[in-house]
């Protein structure tokens, strides 16, 4: 595809679609992006109840760096160095995200990130954004799309060499591309939903809790996480069942809201002066996983991001994996002059790993809900980190591989499983060795501190 200038249509100007457009434009192609929503940089655009904070990690950072955007994005982010776990009894415990200084996450506002990516893509020659434009049909054989203004009016037709479906979990491109094919499709809704809440800046202008961390309030029937913002506030996401005794439906009066938070998240309730209003007014979002195949048709159509592999948000990899799609698609289009071969290589390179990511995201939901506050979980994580410090070339915790490297997801899980088998076989002997190593490390630190005071 890199041999001549071609016309590409991208359907969806979200994060994945806009970044894909930028990569394709850098290959020298003419790119039209059609998006049913308004320009995200305009006052009319809204988050539609979706999470407005995102956790940027290594895969997403690599993708942004590939088009020269990383430094600018990091200026608009807040580093998250730890996961701070809040217990119902008011206790707080920090769990480091990694063992090395650079192993941190970055919290960024969705609206700021998408504005940066859209503006960068729009600045490229041959790139045109068409907002408030709804895809009504796709001819997968010819690459012809028909698009109508959302406000009504005459539809237009565009024929492209390649159509990129970046139109989200309920993708119209996917539906029309797979129509009549022997296609697999599975959609799994979690019985839980989510609602966005806020911990505002304190009356003194200072953050009400430690800012450079992801805060987690775990619980079997409800859990909450909070991402930091540059203004000192935090954006909270409350996860719980849609229906039932402990659910969003049950939070139907101010008294019910306050009683629920005082029992479940007592230290958070006092930090949220607008809690009742936000619970009442903010919409409940849905959580869904999508697995599908194929991701492409011949040399004409390809899917990226949620259109190909939506996952639950509990590993913080939805945006990062979508950005990684853009990198791999770019690499495949460069490596294979035959576009059909390039699209096949892209799907083969990505799908096995995004399937594993879906499983990891579900498992991490269970960890955040049930296990992250337990001492056994903390001890296991601490042992994992210690082994990584002692054996940096041989031992890497699963979370570190997923969040802080670009090791493909399935390869990361396979390596983590091998490490787990080693621990199980070694049993008490290795546990003792790790304990002795930890003691020795603590003694070394103590000696250094005493020497520094002399």
Curated annotation (Swiss-Prot):
Pathway the protein contributes to: Cofactor biosynthesis; NAD(+) biosynthesis; quinolinate from L-kynurenine: step 1/3
EC number assigned by the record: 1.14.13.9
Q: Write out the transmembrane intervals.
A: none
Matching Pfam families, A to Z?
FAD_binding_3
Sorted UniProt keywords: FAD, Flavoprotein, Monooxygenase, NADP, Oxidoreductase, Pyridine nucleotide biosynthesis
Cofactor names:
FAD
Instruction: Look at the named UniProt entry and state the broad enzyme category this protein falls under.
Output: oxidoreductase
**Reactions catalysed:** L-kynurenine + NADPH + O2 + H(+) = 3-hydroxy-L-kynurenine + NADP(+) + H2O
Role noted for this protein: Catalyzes the hydroxylation of L-kynurenine (L-Kyn) to form 3-hydroxy-L-kynurenine (L-3OHKyn). Required for synthesis of quinolinic acid.
Question: Which family does the entry's similarity section mention?
Answer: Belongs to the aromatic-ring hydroxylase family. KMO subfamily.
Q: What is this protein called?
A: Kynurenine 3-monooxygenase
Q: What is the lineage of its organism?
A: Bacteria, Bacillati, Actinomycetota, Actinomycetes, Micromonosporales
GN (gene name)? kmo
């Amino acid at each position: 595809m890199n041999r001549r200038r071609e016309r590409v249509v991208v359907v969806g100007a979200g994060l994945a679609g806009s970044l894909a457009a930028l990569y394709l434009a850098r290959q020298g192609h003419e790119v039209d992006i059609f998006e049913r929503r308004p320009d995200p940089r305009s006052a009319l655009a809204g988050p539609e109840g979706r999470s407005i904070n995102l956790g940027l990690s290594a895969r997403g950072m690599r993708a942004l760096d590939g088009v020269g955007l990383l430094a600018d994005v990091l200026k608009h982010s807040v580093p998250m160095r730890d996961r701070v776990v809040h217990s119902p009894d008011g206790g707080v415990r920090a769990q480091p995200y990694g063992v090395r200084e650079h192993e941190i996450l970055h919290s960024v506002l969705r609206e700021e990130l998408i504005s940066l990516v859209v503006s960068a893509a729009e600045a490229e020659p041959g790139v045109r954004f068409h907002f408030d434009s709804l895809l009504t049909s796709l001819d997968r054989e010819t690459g012809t799309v028909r698009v109508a203004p959302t406000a009504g009016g005459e539809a237009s037709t565009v024929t492209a060499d390649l159509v990129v479906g970046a139109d989200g979990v309920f993708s119209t491109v996917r539906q029309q591309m797979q129509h009549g094919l022997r296609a697999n499709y599975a959609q799994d809704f979690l019985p839980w939903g989510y609602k966005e809440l806020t911990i505002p800046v304190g009356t003194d202008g200072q953050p009400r809790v430690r800012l450079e961390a992801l805060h987690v309030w775990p619980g079997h029937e409800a859990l909450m996480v909070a991402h930091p913002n540059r203004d000192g506030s935090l954006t909270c996401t409350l996860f719980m069942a849609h229906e039932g005794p402990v659910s969003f439906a049950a939070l139907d009066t101010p008294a019910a809201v306050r009683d629920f938070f005082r029992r479940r998240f007592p230290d958070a309730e006092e930090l949220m002066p607008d809690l009742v209003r936000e619970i009442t007014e903010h919409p409940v979002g849905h959580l869904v996983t999508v697995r599908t195949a194929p991701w492409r048709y011949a040399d004409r159509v390809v899917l990226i991001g949620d259109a190909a592999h939506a996952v639950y948000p509990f590993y913080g990899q939805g945006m990062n994996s979508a950005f990684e799609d853009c990198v791999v698609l770019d690499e495949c289009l460069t490596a294979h002059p035959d576009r059909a071969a390039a699209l096949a290589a892209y799907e083969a390179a990505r799908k096995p790993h995004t399937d594993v990511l879906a499983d990891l995201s579900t498992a991490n939901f269970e960890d955040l809900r049930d296990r992250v506050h337990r001492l056994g979980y903390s001890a296991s994580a601490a042992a994992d980190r210690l082994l990584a410090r002692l054996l940096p070339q041989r031992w890497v915790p699963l979370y570190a591989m997923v969040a802080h490297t670009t090791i493909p997801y399935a390869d990361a899980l396979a390596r983590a499983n091998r490490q787990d088998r080693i621990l199980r076989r070694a049993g008490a002997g290795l546990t003792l060795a790790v304990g002795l190593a930890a003691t020795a490390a603590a003694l070394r630190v103590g000696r250094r501190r005493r020497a520094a005071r002399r």
